[in-house]
């Protein structure tokens, strides 16, 4: 699929990192990360919320195959997705925080709207 960022990692490590970030975002409501990671995480998180809005068994199984914690999938389908029933996309928001002290990478807060 064209347009995906490699984030300086092999595919398996990159997908594991993104799965963990999506799980953390859905669990806590917001995460702090770099801009490029946030853009990739945002795309995948919005797909998970759209699956939650579908609400059928197939959607739940697809979400379980991506999200790393079963309790988070339950929360996604029971609490998060119904909150966005009237919204068509745009479930997340990004705030710039500033550069990271160690390497100067631009940091953002990615949160659910």
From Swiss-Prot:
Gene3D superfamilies: Ribosomal protein L17 (3.90.1030.10). It comes from the Bacteria. PANTHER family: LARGE RIBOSOMAL SUBUNIT PROTEIN BL17M, RIBOSOMAL PROTEIN L17. InterPro entries: Ribosomal_bL17, Ribosomal_bL17_CS, Ribosomal_bL17_sf. Belongs to the bacterial ribosomal protein bL17 family. GO terms for cellular component: cytosolic large ribosomal subunit. It holds the Pfam family Ribosomal_L17. The keyword Metal-binding does not apply. Keywords: Ribonucleoprotein, Ribosomal protein. Transmembrane segments: none annotated. Part of the 50S ribosomal subunit. Contacts protein L32. GO terms for molecular function: structural constituent of ribosome. It comes from Clostridium tetani (strain Massachusetts / E88). One of its GO terms (biological process) is translation. The keyword Ribonucleoprotein applies. This is Large ribosomal subunit protein bL17.
């Amino acid at each position: 699929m064209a347009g995906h960022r490699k984030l300086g990692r092999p595919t398996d490590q990159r997908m594991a990192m993104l799965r963990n970030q999506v799980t953390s975002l859905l669990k806590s409501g917001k995460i702090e990360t770099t801009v490029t990671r946030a853009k990739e995480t945002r795309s995948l998180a919005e797909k998970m919320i759209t699956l939650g809005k579908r609400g059928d068994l197939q959607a739940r199984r697809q979400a379980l195959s991506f999200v790393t914690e079963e309790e988070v999938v339950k929360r996604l389908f029971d609490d998060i997705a119904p909150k966005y029933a009237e919204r068509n996309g745009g479930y997340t928001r990004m705030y710039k925080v500033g550069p990271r002290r160690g390497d100067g990478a631009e940091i953002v807060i990615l949160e659910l709207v």
